[in-house]
Amino acid sequence: MNENLQDLISTKLAAAIANPLFPAVDSQLRSGRHIGQEHLDNYAFLADFQNELDGFYRRYNVELIRAPEGFFYLRPKATTLIARSVLSELEMLVGKVLCYLYLSPERLAQQGIFTVQEVYDELLNLADEAKLLKAVNLRASGSDLDKQKLAEKVRAALGRLRRLGMLYTVGEQNSGKFTISESVFRFGAEVRAGDDPIEAQLRLIRDGEAATPESIAAEKATADDESAVSNEEDFEYDDNQEGAE
């Protein structure tokens, strides 16, 4: 019986599944969460058993990806047996702004800490206001009431991205302050060698183009000619979904 079992599952995969960290890590990955180096134990666990767990998840038609920046996440295939993370248009746009802020000089000047208000202001500054209001199904009048509703949607979008492991609250839960994780590079612009990454991300926000899940660093370091996979294949896009889950 044991010999037959060993033919089906490797000793190292069995050790990974038996590890007390596995249930929590597995649940987080399946929920769409990104696990970076900030989570020391969980990250070390995934790094130690990456190959074995990737084979395990491929049985569900998903891949365990380790991004160039180091964070782990599950990338579903079209035939996935695990539910996909569905992001609204506004959540995608807020994610792109977070990536822009991560690349900005202000991140170092502010010790990596940003506020919800800064994201909202940057969003209004960088993106077309009419497109923003349309993205949240509001009339494009630009009234104070519309902007208030938009601000609420932005807060909800940030909450969703926080649950996906893309930002971390600083201080009190309702402080409005947070740090940005490297996993926001899931929203990074596709940049060819020699391009300014900040300018490229700025163009992405202004043009409202689809982002790619490949990081800027990977684009610069990789010489192959394969097309980058669009975010819509990783984060399923839903026109009708609002900002909150």
UniProtKB/Swiss-Prot annotation:
Places the protein is found: Cytoplasm, Nucleoid
Region (Disordered): 213-245
Bias type Acidic residues, positions: 224-245
Pfam families: MukE (PF04288)
Keywords: Cell cycle, Cell division, Chromosome partition, Cytoplasm, DNA condensation
GO biological process: cell division; chromosome condensation; chromosome segregation; DNA replication
GO cellular component, one term: cytoplasm
Primary location: cytoplasm
UniProt function note: Involved in chromosome condensation, segregation and cell cycle progression. May participate in facilitating chromosome segregation by condensation DNA from both sides of a centrally located replisome during cell division. Probably acts via its interaction with MukB and MukF.
Family named by the database record: Belongs to the MukE family.
Subunit organization: Interacts, and probably forms a ternary complex, with MukF and MukB. The complex formation is stimulated by calcium or magnesium.
Name of this chain's protein: Chromosome partition protein MukE
